[in-house]
Structures are given as structure tokens and as C-alpha cells.
Curated annotation (Swiss-Prot):
Induction: Up-regulated in the presence of IGF1, insulin and other growth-stimulating factors such as growth hormone, EGF and phorbol esters. SMART domains: IB, TY. One of its GO terms (molecular function) is insulin-like growth factor binding. The modification Phosphoserine is found at S148, S194, S201, S202. CDD domains: TY. This is Insulin-like growth factor-binding protein 3. Changing S202A: No change in apoptotic potential.
Amino acid sequence: MQRARPTLWAAALTLLVLLRGPPVARAGASSAGLGPVVRCEPCDARALAQCAPPPAVCAELVREPGCGCCLTCALSEGQPCGIYTERCGSGLRCQPSPDEARPLQALLDGRGLCVNASAVSRLRAYLLPAPPAPGNASESEEDRSAGSVESPSVSSTHRVSDPKFHPLHSKIIIIKKGHAKDSQRYKVDYESQSTDTQNFSSESKRETEYGPCRREMEDTLNHLKFLNVLSPRGVHIPNCDKKGFYKKKQCRPSKGRKRGFCWCVDKYGQPLPGYTTKGKEDVHCYSMQSK
């Protein structure tokens, strides 16, 4: 289990590196105050002393994936790569296939490819064009207006007479919005009043349908829902019959060294006279048994 933790951290860090972009972009993000997501332990002399000698025949040596400090052979262009494989060489990035339906899963399975980083950047810029700057918003609007189907022979006076730009039309829109807002407010108030009425009717219906024991049990269970720490001390779930009234024998459970006890009540939960046996475990309630 302890050996699996560094592997998981290495996989998480490698995935973040692949998704966050090249080292230049990551350095810019760190200088902007974002900072790295995962901080690796420094590769000091003690960590480097535990590394095995690097392979003898390697075109390029790179660090192990994730937070590893040892050196290993870099992957060349076109070789398969992924989260758990070695790093790609200089100027290369591990990318899933363009037609891959599940790109992240492909990287986890090692089905990516080491491709040229500059080609990846050009492809990303082509597929994901940068949003227009705030200062060029008006220019883009003018370009879209110029490229519309509107004939250039239409005079400017005809555009001004458009009812959308008429002051009276603007006032009508404001009035309609005000009416819609008032009607929506009335609708919300009406729905809240109707909901309160329904809740009151359901509460009154519950009072007539269920007995006092059932109501106490439901109130206790509802109270337990809002407790952050559930403790058996002080929590008593009553013993109810099918009609919601109290059964004759009510008991409290044992709490550690303190033994539980039982007592006798009537159908409304009132203690029965003559049954002063509170504190005894074996209690027999004979008369007035609730059905």
C-alpha cells in the first residue's frame, strides 16, 4: 500500500503536466501567482543516491515521470506514451490520437503518441481560436453588420425609422417587463400561500390519522436528521402499535455499564398507576394491553 502512493502521485502529476501545457506556459502561470498544483519533493543528494545508473544506450536522458528524480531514456517521436510511461524527448509532447473518443482514458492506458510540440500548438490554435480582445468588440460587430444580407442601397433614414430603435418602442418594452415582473411576484406569493395551506392540511390530517406515539416517533426521527453527532444518550424511540398509539411496555436500552429498564404506560403514553417498576429489567404489564 505504501509503494502504491508514490505511483498514484506520479500519475496525478504527469496528467496535470500533460493537460496544463508546455513548461513555458507553466512557468508563466507560476509567475502570475497561480503556483504549481502539486509540489514535488526536492531531488537532493539523498534522493539521487537511491537511483540506479542510467541506461548506457540512450539518445536522450530525461527524468522519470511524475516526481521521480532518477534518469531514464526519453521516448522518441511517434512512440506510444501515457501517464505511466517515460517522458517524451525534447520538443515533443504526449498527445492522444485526434480521433480518440476518450482522450484522457487513452493517456491513462498509454495509447498516446509523442508528437512535435510546435505542431500541437499550431493545431490547437487552429481548432481553438483565441477570443477577440475587448477593444475589438465593436469592430467585430461592424464586420458582421457589413457581411449581412442587407442591401447597401438602403438609406440611413430607413434604418433610423426601424421600430426597434424608436423611443416609444423602448418605453413599451420597459412597461411590459414591469408587468411581467409584477405577475411573476404575484405568482410566487400565491404559490407560497397555497403551499402553506397544503402543509397545514397535511399536518391536521396526520393528527387525525396517527396516534400520539407515531407522532412522537416521527418527530424524534426528524430531529435526528439535523444532528451532526449521533449519540444514543437521551434518544428514546417509543414502542408504537399499528394504529400509532403507545404499546403497554416501553423500554430504554442499556448504555455501557448502565442497564436498560422498562415501564408500563397506557395507550396515550401516561405511566400506569401501581406499576412503579422503573429500573427493573423484567417488567410484565398485564392490564389495559393496547391492541
